């Protein structure tokens, strides 16, 4: 019964739906935040690394009507879920799904933008289900290795957008700076006004750039904050 529920579980957004299949990463606020926040300009080519269900690819396709998107995942179950969701979407012709390991994948071109919600659990615990272990732990995609791939995948003036928990995000940024990358847009996310920052949204560049720091509070006393509603209203059904 659990397997059937997982296979049939779906999440509806305003312009598309996501079916999770047996993918290791369910729909999360992290993914919606990143897909809504990434890229202040309109990139023409986007690489979605570790695409999971294809959520970020579909969000980018909706936001950027002229973008062509490549969605990549090492897990076959994730690739199959992303491919199914691509085919069911209004933008199937602008999204290409590939089953490949980003550390060994050799694209024919570089990308104007990269989007990635990386795995981050470094606790050493191993999830019982191998698909979830691959998705949630830095087993198959170490942050250092991912950072080292960025200059090979990005165009010279390209940008890579990420979301991570605060501690892991700070470590990731430190590694990126050591590798000669530069932080541009940077947003600290708080769940509520009285709770500390728990997520970082940030963008990395290959060339020096002016850092732009902001803060986002998800919920206030009366419900979702106006800033969160404005950011996500094109996607969530109940956001007007």
Swiss-Prot record:
GO cellular component terms, semicolon-separated:
cytoplasm
Q: Which family does it belong to?
A: Belongs to the methyltransferase superfamily. tRNA (adenine-N(6)-)-methyltransferase family.
Single GO molecular function: tRNA (adenine-N6)-methyltransferase activity
Task: Give the EC number(s) listed in the UniProt record.
Answer: 2.1.1.223
Protein name, per record: tRNA1(Val) (adenine(37)-N6)-methyltransferase
Tell me the superkingdom of the source.
Answer: Bacteria
GO terms, biological process: methylation; tRNA processing
Report if keyword Methyltransferase is assigned.
Answer: yes
Q: Which reaction does it catalyse?
A: adenosine(37) in tRNA1(Val) + S-adenosyl-L-methionine = N(6)-methyladenosine(37) in tRNA1(Val) + S-adenosyl-L-homocysteine + H(+)
Keyword Ion transport recorded: no
Role description: Specifically methylates the adenine in position 37 of tRNA(1)(Val) (anticodon cmo5UAC).
Q: Where in the cell is it found?
A: Cytoplasm
Q: Which UniProt keywords apply?
A: Cytoplasm, Methyltransferase, S-adenosyl-L-methionine, Transferase, tRNA processing
The intrachain disulfides are none
**Which InterPro entries does the record associate with it?**
DNA_methylase_N6_adenine_CS (IPR002052), SAM-dependent_MTases_sf (IPR029063), Small_mtfrase_dom (IPR007848), tRNA_Adenine-N(6)_MTase (IPR050210), tRNA_adenine-N6_MeTrfase (IPR022882)
The source organism is: Vibrio cholerae serotype O1 (strain ATCC 39315 / El Tor Inaba N16961)
Q: Which residues form the signal peptide?
A: none
């Amino acid at each position: 019964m659990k397997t059937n529920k997982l296979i049939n579980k779906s999440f509806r957004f305003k312009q598309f739906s996501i079916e999770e299949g047996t993918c290791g990463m369910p729909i999360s606020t992290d993914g919606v935040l990143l897909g809504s926040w990434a890229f202040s300009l309109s990139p023409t080519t986007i690489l979605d690394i570790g695409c999971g269900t294809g959520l970020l690819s579909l969000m980018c396709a909706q936001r950027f009507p002229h973008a062509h998107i490549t969605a990549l995942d090492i897990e076959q179950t994730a690739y199959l879920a992303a491919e199914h969701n691509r085919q069911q979407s209004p933008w199937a012709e602008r999204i290409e799904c590939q089953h490949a390991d980003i550390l060994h994948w050799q694209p024919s071109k570089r990308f104007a933008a990269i989007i990635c919600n990386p795995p981050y659990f470094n606790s050493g615990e191993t999830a019982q289900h191998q698909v979830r272990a691959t998705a949630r732990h830095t087993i198959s995609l170490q942050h250092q290795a991912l950072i080292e791939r960025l200059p090979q995948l990005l165009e010279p003036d390209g940008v890579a957008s990420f979301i991570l928990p605060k501690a892991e995000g700070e470590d990731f940024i430190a590694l990126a700076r050591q590798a000669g990358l530069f932080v541009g847009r940077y947003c600290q996310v708080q769940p509520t006004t009285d709770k500390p920052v728990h997520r970082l949204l940030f963008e990395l560049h290959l060339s020096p750039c002016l850092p732009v720091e902001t803060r986002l509070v998800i919920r206030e006393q009366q419900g979702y904050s106006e800033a969160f509603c404005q950011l996500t209203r094109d996607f969530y059904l109940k956001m007007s």
